[in-house]
Amino acid sequence: MGLTFFDKARELTEELEKTQAENIHQAAKLVAESIMNEGIIQAFGSGHSYAAAIEVCGRAGGLIPSKVIMDPAGGYYESIEGVGSLLTHRLQAKPNDIFFLISNSGRNPMGIELAEWIKAQGCKLIVVTALDASQTAASRHSSGKLLYEFADVILDNRSVQGDAALELDGLEGKVCGTSSFSAVLLLQQTIYEAVELMLEKGYTPPVYRSANIDGGYEYNFAIEDKFADRIFHL
C-alpha cells in the first residue's frame, strides 16, 4: 500500500503548522479586533469551498457574530464574470467586519469580484487558497487579477495543482483532494487563537454552544439576538 490519506493528512498538518503559524496569528489578530469592535465574520466559499466557509459560521465552538455568504448556484457560475458583482447587491458590510474568502485556485471571477467589493467597503480580508497553484494559474477575470492579491492575510492550504494528491497504480489521475482538510485546520486554529487573544485582553468572546446540549439553544439565542440584524441578513 502506498501513501494513504491518513499519511497525507499527517504530512499536511505538520507542514501547515510549520509554514502558516505566523499568518494564522496575523489572521487571528484581525478576527479578534473585528469582534471586539462589534464587527462580524462573513465567509464565502464556492463549490466545495463552501464546506470551509461554514466551519467558521454558526457552529458549536465558533464565534456567534458570524454568517456564511450563500452561493445560490452552488458554484456552477463561479467562472462567469459579473455573477460575483450581482451577489454583492445582496450583501451588507460595516468597516469593522472581517471576511474570509476560500478558493483553492483563486482564479474565478466570482471570488475576485467579491474581493473587490469587500476592499471597497474598507473591510479586512483573509484569503484561504493554494498559493503556489494560484500564482501559476491564469486569471479568468478580465482584470487579470487573482484572489490572493486582495488579501490582508493569506492562509496557504499547501494543496497541489488540481487539489487531488494521491496516486494509485492503474489510475491515470490522482485521488483525494486536500484543500478542505487543510482549510479546516487553518480556520479552526485561527478562531482558537482569536478567542485566546480576546481573553488575554479581558474580553469575553461570544462563542456558540451546541444546540444539542441542555441550555445550549437558549444561551445561543440570547446572544444571537444582539446581532440578529447582521447575522440573519439575507
UniProtKB/Swiss-Prot annotation:
GO molecular function term, any single one: carbohydrate derivative binding
Transmembrane spans:
none
SIS domain location is: 31-205
Sections of the chain in a coiled coil: none
**Among the record's GO biological process terms, what is one?**
carbohydrate derivative metabolic process
- Domain of life of the organism encoding this protein: Bacteria
In terms of InterPro entries, this protein maps to: RpiR-like_SIS, SIS_dom, SIS_dom_sf, SIS_GmhA/DiaA_subfam, UPF0309
Q: Which Pfam families match?
A: SIS_2 (PF13580)
Task: State the HAMAP family in the record.
Answer: UPF0309 (MF_01240)
Q: What is this protein called?
A: UPF0309 protein lin0024
Q: What is the protein's species of origin?
A: Listeria innocua serovar 6a (strain ATCC BAA-680 / CLIP 11262)
